């Protein structure tokens, strides 16, 4: 394992010449990634170097608040030296400090993180229990507050689009051996900012090192989970979309993906646009007003952008979603849209974090009032989604990868590999082997159970 971004960042801070960084990084890529050629390796390391240089420019901006947001508090103590994850005195101390951040939110749980128990508890009545977990955006490792903030929103969105009210959050954070402990606190503070804003407690989690003693560097790898409940009514799952429904969307300002684009292209002021909990508030309004019961399906525009979500809904619900391009573009925050268009990034292929609501037409006006959504399309018979642009009706299909939204992603590209079908067959076989192993162990457990 090698953290290329961390390597380049450290080299720049040590004033190592750029040609030396490229030369050494190029060799390391070829050494570790056996399936790439020299041309790709050189382009790749150059793109990483340019990205890191761009993000480092935030230290020169005049906006002190934004600068503080992007920096994390440095303790000068690494994960390894403090013994984090080693289940001793240093580890216990760090966990008590994490609990102190959680306590500062004043969002109550029945058994909270500050009690240092093995699990947290909240009280809830439920007809259905809904759970989701989201991984932190990989490129926000050096911006842990933003990473924690946006992954928490992502997990909560996944709960709310099912028609559930969130009742608890959990977190999992791994920081490599040389990472400053302050990164963990900054990440947790990002989670807790959302927790406090929407009144959902962070009740537990796990804190370890990436690879223990075996991985050096300061890479942060993390996730946040959310638990929600549906007290009455039915889930608003994608499969429930019906012919004749209308499609509404709220304004989306993006989350981790848009933040990453802003950071790695130097559009730092766009980051402010992403700092909101509008999506969650809109969903809470739907639940508390009772209008959630009138909605057939909801989703967040994230997975491969509108292209990906529309495609998946069509396949799952076996209906055709028809979108008006001009109206869809009105649901993208103007500053975010400007950035995407200037950088030649397809706005329909990235996560904009709009709330998409599919409902009967007779309830649309009431739903618009409590969410701020606008009507962008409708559902008809068929199994493919389309974008209407003037007289043109364009199929909405996802690319092999989402729109390339950083310089490195533009090097990697969006095109499907030529041997993709062969790759799928190999992946299927690996999955089959995993199922066989699971079945073997289940039988083993059944045999052992008979001894009692």
UniProtKB/Swiss-Prot annotation:
SUPFAM superfamilies: PurM C-terminal domain-like, PurM N-terminal domain-like. One of its GO terms (molecular function) is thiamine-phosphate kinase activity. One of its GO terms (biological process) is thiamine biosynthetic process. InterPro entries: Ni_metllenz_mat, PurM-like_C_dom, PurM-like_C_sf, PurM-like_N, PurM-like_N_sf, ThiL-like. Belongs to the HypE family. PANTHER family: HYDROGENASE EXPRESSION_FORMATION PROTEIN, THIAMINE-MONOPHOSPHATE KINASE. This is Uncharacterized protein MJ1416. It comes from Methanocaldococcus jannaschii (strain ATCC 43067 / DSM 2661 / JAL-1 / JCM 10045 / NBRC 100440) (Methanococcus jannaschii). The lineage of its organism: Archaea, Methanobacteriati, Methanobacteriota, Methanomada group, Methanococci.
């Amino acid at each position: 394992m090698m953290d290329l971004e961390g390597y380049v960042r450290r080299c720049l801070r040590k004033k190592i010449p750029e040609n030396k960084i490229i030369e050494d990084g190029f060799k390391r890529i070829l050494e570790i990634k056996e399936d790439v050629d020299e041309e790709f390796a050189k382009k790749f390391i150059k793109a990483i170097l340019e990205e890191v240089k761009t993000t480092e420019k935030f230290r020169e901006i005049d906006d002190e608040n934004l600068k503080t947001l992007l920096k994390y508090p440095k303790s000068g103590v690494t994960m390894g030296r403090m013994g984090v994850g080693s289940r001793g005195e240093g580890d216990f101390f760090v966990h008590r400090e994490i609990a102190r951040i959680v306590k500062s939110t004043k969002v109550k749980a029945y058994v909270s993180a500050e009690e240092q128990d093995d699990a947290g508890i909240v009280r809830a009545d439920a007809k259905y229990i809904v759970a989701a977990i989201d991984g932190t955006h990989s490129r926000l490792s050096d911006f842990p507050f933003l990473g924690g903030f946006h992954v928490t929103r992502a997990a909560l969105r996944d709960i709310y689009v099912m028609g559930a009210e969130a009742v608890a959050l959990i977190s999992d954070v791994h920081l490599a051996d040389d990472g400053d402990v302050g990164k963990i606190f900054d990440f947790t503070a990002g989670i807790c900012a959302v927790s406090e804003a929407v009144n959902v407690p962070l009740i537990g989690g796990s804190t370890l090192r990436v690879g223990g003693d075996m991985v050096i560097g300061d890479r942060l790898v993390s996730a946040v989970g959310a638990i929600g409940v549906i007290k009455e009514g039915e889930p608003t799952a994608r499969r429930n979309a019906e012919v004749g429904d209308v499609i509404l969307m709220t304004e989306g300002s993006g989350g981790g993906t848009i933040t990453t684009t802003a950071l790695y292209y130097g559009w730092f002021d766009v980051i402010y646009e992403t700092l909101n909990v509008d999506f969650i508030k809109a969903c809470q309004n739907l639940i508390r007003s009772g209008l959630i019961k009138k909605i057939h399906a909801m989703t967040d525009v994230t997975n491969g952008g509108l292209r990906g979500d529309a495609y998946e809904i069509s396949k799952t619900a076996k209906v055709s979603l028809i979108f008006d391009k001009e109206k869809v573009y009105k649901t993208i925050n103007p500053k975010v849209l400007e950035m995407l268009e200037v950088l030649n990034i397809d706005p329909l292929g990235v996560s904009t974090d709009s709330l998409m609501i599919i409902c009967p037409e007779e309830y649309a006006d009431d739903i618009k009032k409590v969410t701020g959504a606008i009507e962008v399309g409708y559902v008809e018979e068929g199994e493919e989604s389309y974008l209407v642009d003037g007289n043109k009706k364009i199929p909405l299909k996802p690319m092999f990868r989402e729109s390339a939204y950083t310089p490195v992603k533009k090097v990697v590209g969006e095109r499907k590999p030529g041997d993709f079908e062969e790759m799928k067959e190999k992946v299927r076989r690996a999955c089959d082997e995993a199922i066989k192993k699971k079945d073997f162990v289940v039988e083993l457990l059944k045999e052992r159970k008979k001894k009692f």
